[in-house]
Amino acid sequence: MNNLGRILFLVLAVVTAIWLNYEEGTTSAPSRQSIASGASQDYLLAVSWQPAFCEQRPNKAECRSQRAGRFDTSHFSLHGLWPQPRNETYCNVSSETVATDKSGRWSRLPKLDLSVGLRNELERKMPGYRSYLHRHEWFKHGTCMPGFSPERYFRVSLDLLDQLNASAVRELAAGNVNTNLGFRDVSHAYGRAFGNDAQTRFILDCYRDDGRRIVHELKLSISGDLGETTDLATLISAGDVVGKSCPGGIVDPVGLQ
């Protein structure tokens, strides 16, 4: 073999080795699947103040049945757990299912395999379950958490919600119904509950209703491997600093105001 032939042979061998390594995932950047299965990820945990939600949508099934004393009138309710960035949605979901979801026909989405105990807990802590919110949240967001089944996705979400509801943040909201709650008040309670860094890792959402500004939702910035820990303080401390919140508003009581 002449020198040119030897050079071509060596080049071909190197290229083949690189290609094989790439196929086996030993070179280049790891795939999204491998990132999600072991390394940290960023999320937003969205929780609602349900009376405020029902102020806007009183005809929803979960709002027609809302009564004083029900869990969601004095505790935050689960909206969803959203992998970030925000365009991380509908992973490996059929175009037909995506179209059904985007049209708002959530009752026509495929049923989820959930245990009886979990369904009962969701009905209590995620009132939108009555309007099939759980199906929407799974197909839009939960499918982008590789290795998570619907059961595990909602178990983790409810675990995080329970920790928030056991904190000074929930006590502050429940203790100030029908009064104005400022952003600083919420921020201080959030810091007491989860550490000073937490004060820059949540968004307070509000909306206008006949001249009133109403506290509607909290979005918690968290980061970590949810397969390893669901300790909310730990996840919040690793979360991204988030953007501007509303300056505060009324904590809405049950019923139309």
Language model region names:
Residues T26-N176:
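Catalytic cores of phosphodiester-bond-cleaving enzymes
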Residues R6-N21:
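Hydrophobic membrane-insertion alpha-helices, especially the h-region
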Residues N2, T26-A29, L118-Q257:
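C-terminal, well-folded lobe of enzymatic/effector domains
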